[in-house]
Amino acid sequence: MAEKLRMAARVFVYGTLKRGEPNHHWLTKKENGQARFLGRGKTETKFPLVVGTRYNIPFLLARPGEGNHIEGEVYEVDETMLSKLDILEDYPDYYDREQQTILMEQNETIQCWLYLIRNFPDKMLAKELLISYHNTPERPYNEKSVRTVSARDDLSY
Protein backbone atom coordinates (compact mmCIF):
# COMPACT_ATOMS: atom_id res chain seq x y z
CA MET A 1 0.00 0.00 0.00
CA ALA A 2 2.83 2.43 0.79
CA GLU A 3 4.18 2.12 -2.78
CA LYS A 4 0.85 3.21 -4.25
CA LEU A 5 0.88 6.32 -2.07
CA ARG A 6 4.27 7.35 -3.47
CA MET A 7 3.10 7.12 -7.06
CA ALA A 8 2.05 10.54 -8.29
CA ALA A 9 0.69 10.16 -11.79
CA ARG A 10 -0.15 7.97 -14.73
CA VAL A 11 1.71 8.68 -17.95
CA PHE A 12 0.85 7.46 -21.45
CA VAL A 13 3.95 6.90 -23.61
CA TYR A 14 3.64 6.43 -27.36
CA GLY A 15 7.18 6.82 -28.71
CA THR A 16 10.76 6.22 -27.66
CA LEU A 17 9.82 5.55 -24.01
CA LYS A 18 7.90 2.35 -24.82
CA ARG A 19 9.41 -1.05 -24.04
CA GLY A 20 11.93 -2.03 -26.71
CA GLU A 21 12.43 1.58 -27.85
CA PRO A 22 15.56 3.76 -27.48
CA ASN A 23 14.57 5.82 -24.40
CA HIS A 24 12.82 3.11 -22.38
CA HIS A 25 15.85 3.07 -20.07
CA TRP A 26 14.61 6.39 -18.63
CA LEU A 27 11.71 4.50 -17.06
CA THR A 28 13.90 1.74 -15.61
CA LYS A 29 16.77 3.78 -14.12
CA LYS A 30 16.33 3.80 -10.34
CA GLU A 31 17.95 7.25 -10.05
CA ASN A 32 15.12 8.63 -12.22
CA GLY A 33 12.50 7.51 -9.71
CA GLN A 34 9.84 4.82 -9.86
CA ALA A 35 7.75 3.68 -12.81
CA ARG A 36 5.39 0.73 -12.86
CA PHE A 37 3.95 -0.63 -16.12
CA LEU A 38 0.14 -0.76 -15.95
CA GLY A 39 -0.62 -2.01 -19.45
CA ARG A 40 -1.17 -1.10 -23.06
CA GLY A 41 -3.79 1.33 -24.23
CA LYS A 42 -4.78 3.83 -26.87
CA THR A 43 -5.96 7.41 -26.86
CA GLU A 44 -9.72 7.87 -26.76
CA THR A 45 -9.23 10.99 -28.89
CA LYS A 46 -7.55 10.81 -32.28
CA PHE A 47 -4.23 12.64 -32.70
CA PRO A 48 -1.68 12.94 -35.50
CA LEU A 49 1.46 10.94 -34.60
CA VAL A 50 4.34 11.60 -37.00
CA VAL A 51 8.08 11.05 -37.20
CA GLY A 52 9.94 14.28 -37.91
CA THR A 53 13.26 16.12 -38.03
CA ARG A 54 16.51 14.65 -39.32
CA TYR A 55 16.65 12.78 -35.98
CA ASN A 56 13.45 10.78 -36.61
CA ILE A 57 11.67 11.87 -33.45
CA PRO A 58 8.06 10.77 -32.86
CA PHE A 59 5.78 13.76 -32.31
CA LEU A 60 2.20 13.72 -31.08
CA LEU A 61 0.74 16.88 -32.60
CA ALA A 62 -1.81 18.93 -30.67
CA ARG A 63 -4.60 18.54 -33.21
CA PRO A 64 -7.21 16.50 -31.34
CA GLY A 65 -9.72 14.82 -33.62
CA GLU A 66 -7.24 14.42 -36.49
CA GLY A 67 -5.14 11.32 -37.18
CA ASN A 68 -5.60 8.05 -35.30
CA HIS A 69 -6.26 6.56 -31.90
CA ILE A 70 -2.64 6.29 -30.79
CA GLU A 71 -1.35 3.03 -29.28
CA GLY A 72 1.04 3.15 -26.37
CA GLU A 73 1.82 2.08 -22.82
CA VAL A 74 0.66 3.38 -19.45
CA TYR A 75 2.97 3.76 -16.48
CA GLU A 76 2.32 4.86 -12.95
CA VAL A 77 5.21 7.12 -11.92
CA ASP A 78 6.35 8.97 -8.82
CA GLU A 79 7.09 12.72 -8.65
CA THR A 80 10.80 12.16 -9.26
CA MET A 81 10.17 10.17 -12.45
CA LEU A 82 7.59 12.69 -13.68
CA SER A 83 10.12 15.50 -13.23
CA LYS A 84 12.78 13.47 -15.13
CA LEU A 85 10.32 12.85 -17.97
CA ASP A 86 9.59 16.59 -18.03
CA ILE A 87 13.34 17.17 -18.50
CA LEU A 88 13.57 14.58 -21.30
CA GLU A 89 10.58 16.12 -23.09
CA ASP A 90 11.75 19.70 -22.41
CA TYR A 91 8.41 20.49 -20.78
CA PRO A 92 7.05 23.18 -20.74
CA ASP A 93 9.39 24.93 -23.19
CA TYR A 94 9.08 22.50 -26.12
CA TYR A 95 6.52 19.79 -25.40
CA ASP A 96 3.36 20.39 -23.45
CA ARG A 97 1.84 17.88 -21.05
CA GLU A 98 -1.90 17.38 -20.70
CA GLN A 99 -4.38 14.89 -19.31
CA GLN A 100 -6.10 12.64 -21.83
CA THR A 101 -8.44 9.66 -21.55
CA ILE A 102 -6.78 6.35 -22.40
CA LEU A 103 -8.71 3.19 -23.25
CA MET A 104 -6.85 0.26 -21.69
CA GLU A 105 -6.77 -3.24 -23.20
CA GLN A 106 -9.21 -4.38 -20.50
CA ASN A 107 -11.71 -1.77 -21.82
CA GLU A 108 -11.40 0.48 -18.78
CA THR A 109 -10.69 4.17 -19.29
CA ILE A 110 -8.18 6.10 -17.21
CA GLN A 111 -6.79 9.62 -17.20
CA CYS A 112 -3.10 9.91 -18.04
CA TRP A 113 -0.58 12.61 -18.74
CA LEU A 114 0.83 12.61 -22.25
CA TYR A 115 3.35 14.84 -23.97
CA LEU A 116 2.47 16.62 -27.19
CA ILE A 117 3.76 19.46 -29.28
CA ARG A 118 1.64 22.55 -29.89
CA ASN A 119 3.91 24.68 -32.08
CA PHE A 120 4.87 22.96 -35.30
CA PRO A 121 4.95 23.75 -39.01
CA ASP A 122 1.80 22.78 -40.91
CA LYS A 123 3.86 20.53 -43.17
CA MET A 124 4.23 18.13 -40.22
CA LEU A 125 0.57 17.21 -40.81
CA ALA A 126 1.46 16.04 -44.34
CA LYS A 127 3.75 13.32 -42.95
CA GLU A 128 2.61 9.71 -42.60
CA LEU A 129 0.13 9.52 -39.71
CA LEU A 130 1.02 6.58 -37.49
CA ILE A 131 -1.07 4.51 -35.11
CA SER A 132 1.96 3.15 -33.28
CA TYR A 133 5.61 4.25 -33.26
CA HIS A 134 8.52 1.85 -33.70
CA ASN A 135 12.17 2.74 -34.18
CA THR A 136 13.27 1.22 -37.51
CA PRO A 137 16.50 0.97 -39.52
CA GLU A 138 14.80 3.00 -42.27
CA ARG A 139 14.03 5.83 -39.82
CA PRO A 140 16.50 5.42 -36.95
CA TYR A 141 15.95 7.60 -33.89
CA ASN A 142 18.95 9.74 -32.88
CA GLU A 143 19.38 10.44 -29.17
CA LYS A 144 19.95 13.98 -27.87
CA SER A 145 23.62 13.25 -27.21
CA VAL A 146 24.40 12.84 -30.94
CA ARG A 147 22.34 15.74 -32.31
CA THR A 148 24.09 18.75 -33.80
CA VAL A 149 20.92 20.86 -34.12
CA SER A 150 18.20 21.09 -31.49
CA ALA A 151 15.01 19.24 -32.40
CA ARG A 152 13.07 22.47 -31.88
CA ASP A 153 15.18 24.21 -34.53
CA ASP A 154 14.86 21.21 -36.86
CA LEU A 155 11.06 20.89 -37.09
CA SER A 156 11.04 22.31 -40.62
CA TYR A 157 13.51 19.68 -41.83
Curated annotation (Swiss-Prot):
One Gene Ontology MF term: acyltransferase activity
Keyword Signal assigned: no
Residue spans crossing the bilayer: none
GO cellular component, one term: cytosol
Residues that, per the record, bind substrate: Y14, G15, T16, L17
InterPro entries, A to Z: AIG2-like_dom, GGACT, GGCT-like, GGCT-like_sf
Top EC group: transferase
Active site (catalytic residues): E89 (proton acceptor)
E.C. numbers: 2.3.2.-
Pfam families to which the protein is assigned, alphabetical: GGACT
Domain of life: Eukaryota
Keywords: Acyltransferase, Transferase
Entry's family note: Belongs to the gamma-glutamylcyclotransferase family.
Role, per record: Putative gamma-glutamylcyclotransferase.
The protein's name in its UniProt record: Putative gamma-glutamylcyclotransferase CG2811
UniProt source species: Drosophila melanogaster (Fruit fly)
Native organism taxonomy: Eukaryota, Metazoa, Ecdysozoa, Arthropoda, Hexapoda
